[in-house]
A protein has these predicted regions:
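Bacterial Sec-dependent N-terminal signal peptides
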Residues: 1-30
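Extended, composition-driven regions rather than compact fold-specific motifs
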Residues: 26-114, 127, 131, 135-244
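Short, charge/polar-rich alpha-helical segments
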Residues: 118-128
């Protein structure tokens, strides 16, 4: 009789454990896409169905670029970002900041003027370059103190994101903006080596894989409000040092 009771307890504990694990997995299964936006993830590649703008709404300049350069698949992108901070009053050491960044592809603003398989791949690499920018921002935030922790600029260890985000964002956006234009100029206008560019981007993504956009990053923008209950969107970010 005692053995049966022990066995029943063991079975009960087993099922409790399974339920807890299942619940945890479900909580971690973050949504990374909406009807209008795709947030970058390594296993979510762009397809023709994602380009949902009616070709009849496309400006004549885009039609001309399609005819002149073969640039007939055109995507619309954005680099979404937000910083959530501890809400309300808090004790020393309890303040937290959480940064979310996710490259976004906007379906309603993206169009295929004329079907082109290479054109679709070119757009995927543009999306990947935005992911490079996101990873670089995270990397630089992790290493920024080494550059600015001197006698003239004092670093506050409690709020690294709200202090330095805009400066690093502007720095990376300028660099990768130029990179995207160079890429399009060489691959689309000059009909250069697309594979070389793709391999360069893929290699750099792999180098910075530790700083990849996570499903949680994406879900913050799908939900459009803080994920954690004790957090609120930061009201103030220090201005960029690159802007006077």
């Amino acid at each position: 009789m005692q053995k049966i009771t022990v066995m029943k307890k063991s079975i009960l504990l087993f099922f409790i454990l399974i339920i807890n694990i299942t619940g945890y997995s479900q909580n971690e299964d973050y949504q990374t896409e909406t009807k209008t936006h795709i947030f970058w993830q390594p296993d979510r590649k762009l397809t023709t169905a994602d380009f949902q703008r009616d070709v009849r709404d496309v400006p004549l300049s885009s039609i001309k670029e399609c005819g002149d350069y073969g640039y007939c698949v055109v995507g619309a992108y954005g680099l979404y970002h937000v910083i959530d901070v501890t809400k309300g009053k808090y004790k020393p050491g309890e303040y937290q900041e959480k940064l979310y960044i996710a490259p976004a592809f906007e379906k309603p603003q993206s169009v295929i003027i004329k079907p082109d398989s290479l054109g679709l791949e070119i757009q995927q690499t543009l999306f990947d370059i935005d992911e490079l920018c996101a990873r670089t921002i995270r990397y630089k935030l992790d290493h920024y103190y080494e550059r600015f922790n001197d006698s003239t600029i004092k670093t506050n260890p409690d709020n690294p994101y709200t202090m330095w985000f805009n400066t690093i964002f502007d720095e990376c956006e300028q660099y990768y903006g130029k990179m995207k234009w160079a890429y399009l100029n060489e691959v689309v206008i000059k009909k250069g080596d697309y594979e070389h560019w793709k391999n360069t981007v893929d290699t750099t993504l792999d180098y910075l894989k530790e700083y990849a956009t996570t499903p949680e990053d994406c879900y913050r923008f799908v939900k459009n409000k803080p994920i954690e209950k004790k957090m609120v969107k930061a009201k103030y970010l220090a201005p960029s040092l690159y802007k006077k």
